[in-house]
Swiss-Prot record:
It is an enzyme of class 2 (transferase). Disulfide bonds: none annotated. GO terms for molecular function: thymidylate synthase activity. Pathway: Pyrimidine metabolism; dTTP biosynthesis. InterPro entries: Thymidate_synth/dCMP_Mease, Thymidate_synth/dCMP_Mease_dom, Thymidate_synth/dCMP_Mease_sf, Thymidylate_synthase, Thymidylate_synthase_AS. This is Thymidylate synthase. It comes from Salmonella arizonae (strain ATCC BAA-731 / CDC346-86 / RSK2980). NCBIfam families: PRK01827.1-3, PRK01827.1-5, thym_sym.
């Protein structure tokens, strides 16, 4: 994951000081891209320990179309707690947009099911896209989508995906986002009888929060270790039938975790 450390250094060296919605302050750059060959290992940051339980359960939660944190709490995942209301609701965030995008005539579009059908029946299409950025519902969301738009691409029986992330918390959020979408590519590929290809991450406002500087320098002082390997133990009947226990990360030997405050 040298690319990730190089991005951190670039933000430190070239970033512009900016104010932000949370009032914390950031160093920010605009526009950056990283490419991860998923055949070379699972792109999970090794210079600090990442919480795999949260990454996997959050993705499964998105795929169910869920927008209440009850499922996450049942599985000891608290990463959305700060944004939920007293009933645990988040409004029409990622899961709702992925699985039930509302149409003007009162119907809903299941973007994930549509994408699966396209990959199986029209893999050369240039329209294999999922968007979470629903401008008509942004005001109802507890948090506007950061990872907002992703596209799939098939070549030589390999499935690749490019994500556009309009806002990126490099220290806390980005390791989660990379691993989550890499996992999604592997799952989609398995369901479509393809191999995993590349995951391409493209960032808009790419920033380090001012209260993450000490942690960033500590992480940059560490040497990256070998990437782990993802093993999917079975092939469920559908993309929506995966369980947490279906996934195993082999050979993950990270440096110790580094705590940092979340900007809310």
């Amino acid at each position: 994951m040298k690319q990730y450390l190089e991005l951190m250094k670039k933000v430190l060296d070239e970033g512009t000081q900016k104010n932000d919605r949370t009032g914390t302050g950031t160093l920010s750059i605009f526009g950056h891209q990283m490419r991860f060959n998923l055949q070379e290992g699972f792109p999970l940051v090794t210079t600090k320990r990442c919480h795999l339980r949260s990454i996997i359960h959050e993705l499964l939660w998105f795929l169910q179309g869920d927008t209440n944190i009850a499922y996450l709490h049942e599985n000891n995942v608290t990463i959305w707690d700060e944004w939920a209301d007293e009933n645990g609701d988040l409004g029409p965030v990622y899961g709702k947009q992925w699985r039930a995008w509302p149409t003007p005539d009162g119907h809903h579009i299941d973007q994930i099911t549509t994408v699966l059908s396209q990959l199986k029946n029209d893999p050369d299409s240039r329209r294999i896209i999922v968007s979470a950025w629903n401008v008509g519902e942004l005001d109802k969301m507890a948090l506007a989508p950061c990872h907002a738009f992703f596209q799939f691409y098939v070549a030589d029986r390999k499935l690749s995906c490019q994500l556009y992330q309009r806002s990126c918390d490099v220290f806390l959020g980005l390791p989660f986002n990379i691993a989550s979408y890499a996992l999604l590519v592997h799952m989609m590929a398995q369901q479509c009888d393809l191999e995993a290809g590349d995951f391409i991450w493209t960032g808009g406002d790419t920033h380090l929060y001012s209260n993450h500087m000490e942690q960033t320098h500590l992480q940059l002082s560490r040497e990256p270790r070998a990437l782990p390997k993802l093993v999917i133990k079975r092939k469920p009947d559908s993309l929506f039938d995966y369980r947490f226990d279906d996934f195993e990360i082999e050979g993950y030997d990270p440096h110790p975790g580094i705590k940092a405050p979340v900007a809310i």
